């Protein structure tokens, strides 16, 4: 059920309403001499792109476009408005978009003193716009829907190591419970992880090829304990075309694991300040070639 947030701005022009969609893909903001001349929004509806249509008047200054990533959504729109010469009503002078993942657009138009913010008190996602338009964009309002995505999205940090092997990705979970590292003669032959998602234990697949040396385990006292960083090394070894991960060491908010594998080659660290590690990805063949993580902000 979408919530309608009333339009702010002036009373000029005629009212328009794009209605409610699944989300916003792109916003084209028409530039005017004194502010925003028009708006045209591309929405997502049943995985199709739907154009809302142009509201306002196109000028020779053209459009500026704000694109929303597929795994992101708009949570707030900061709007300024003012009375400009030649208009009998306030017009929208600038629009700035804020997304869930922390992306902020530049202000489109010219920022002025009077302002309002379109947002949902429950942090919902923007799924439609409405307002008033004519010779310019006079007023802007929005629809917000409660979102089913978790309150904090996970972020994928790039994997480090060699380019050989097949890519694998366990995705992101609520947390990590257990780490299994397969020992190889010259480094790490395989990895496997046990995750937690909504009080359910999920064991990810085996990535790489286990050897007779078996797996070593590192257990995390989830949920009070969580992984904050992974240190490791990678190197070129005899008989292998590319780089392989030779050692991994896991750091939590309470302890540091023993090094798994053989510390040799170039050192690396995977971490993001103020985040915990909630998933892993990489590349593997008969050995582990590349290793990366998914992180999520720490919540109090």
Curated annotation (Swiss-Prot):
Residues 2-146, 154-297 form the Jacalin-type lectin domain. The modification N-acetylalanine is found at residue 2. SUPFAM superfamilies: Mannose-binding lectins (SSF51101). Keywords: Acetylation, Lectin, Repeat. Residues 1-20 are annotated as: Disordered. InterPro entries: Jacalin-like_lectin_dom, Jacalin-like_lectin_dom_plant, Jacalin-like_lectin_dom_sf. GO terms for cellular component: nucleus; plasmodesma. GO terms for molecular function: carbohydrate binding. SMART domains: Jacalin (SM00915). GO terms for biological process: response to zinc ion. The keyword Repeat applies. It comes from the Eukaryota. Belongs to the jacalin lectin family. Sugar-binding protein showing significant affinity for (Glc alpha(1-4)Glc)(3) maltohexaose, (Glc alpha(1-6)Glc)(3) isomaltohexaose, Gal alpha(1-4)Gal beta(1-4)Glc, GalNAc alpha(1-3)(Fuc alpha(1-2)) and Gal beta(1-3)(Fuc alpha(1-4))GlcNAc beta(1-3)Gal beta(1-4)Glc. Component of the PYK10 complex, at least composed of PYK10/BGLU23, BGLU21, BGLU22, JAL22, JAL23, PBP1/JAL30, PBP2/JAL31, JAL32, JAL33, JAL34, JAL35, GLL22 and GLL23. This is Jacalin-related lectin 33. The lineage of its organism: Eukaryota, Viridiplantae, Streptophyta, Embryophyta, Tracheophyta. The gene is JAL33.
């Amino acid at each position: 059920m979408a919530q309608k947030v009333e339009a702010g701005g002036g009373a000029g022009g005629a009212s328009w309403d794009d209605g409610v969609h699944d989300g916003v893909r792109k916003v084209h903001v028409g530039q005017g001499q004194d502010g925003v001349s028009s708006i045209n929004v591309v929405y997502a509806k049943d995985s199709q792109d739907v154009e809302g249509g142009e509201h306002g008047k196109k000028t020779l200054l053209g459009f500026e476009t704000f694109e929303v990533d597929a795994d992101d959504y708009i949570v707030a729109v900061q709007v300024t408005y003012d009375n400009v010469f030649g208009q009998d009503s306030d017009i929208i002078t600038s629009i700035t978009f804020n997304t869930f993942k922390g992306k902020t657009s530049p202000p489109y138009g010219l920022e002025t003193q009077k302002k309002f913010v379109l947002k949902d008190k429950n942090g919902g996602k923007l799924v439609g716009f409405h307002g008033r338009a004519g010779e310019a964009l006079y007023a802007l309002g929005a629809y917000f829907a409660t979102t089913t995505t978790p309150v904090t999205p996970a972020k994928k940090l790039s994997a480090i190591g060699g380019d050989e092997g097949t890519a694998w990705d366990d995705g992101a979970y609520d947390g990590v419970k257990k780490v299994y590292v397969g020992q190889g003669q010259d480094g790490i032959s395989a990895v496997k992880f046990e995750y937690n998602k909504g009080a359910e234990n999920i064991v990810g697949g085996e990535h790489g090829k286990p050897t007779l040396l078996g797996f070593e385990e590192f257990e995390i006292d989830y949920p009070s304990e969580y992984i904050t960083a992974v240190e490791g090394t990678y190197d070129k070894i005899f008989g292998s075309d590319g780089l392989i991960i030779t050692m991994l060491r896991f750091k939590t908010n309470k302890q540091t694991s023993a090094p798994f594998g053989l510390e040799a080659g170039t050192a690396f660290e995977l971490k993001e300040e103020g985040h915990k590690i909630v998933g892993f990805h990489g590349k593997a063949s008969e050995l582990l070639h590349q290793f990366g993580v998914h992180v999520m902000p720490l919540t109090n």
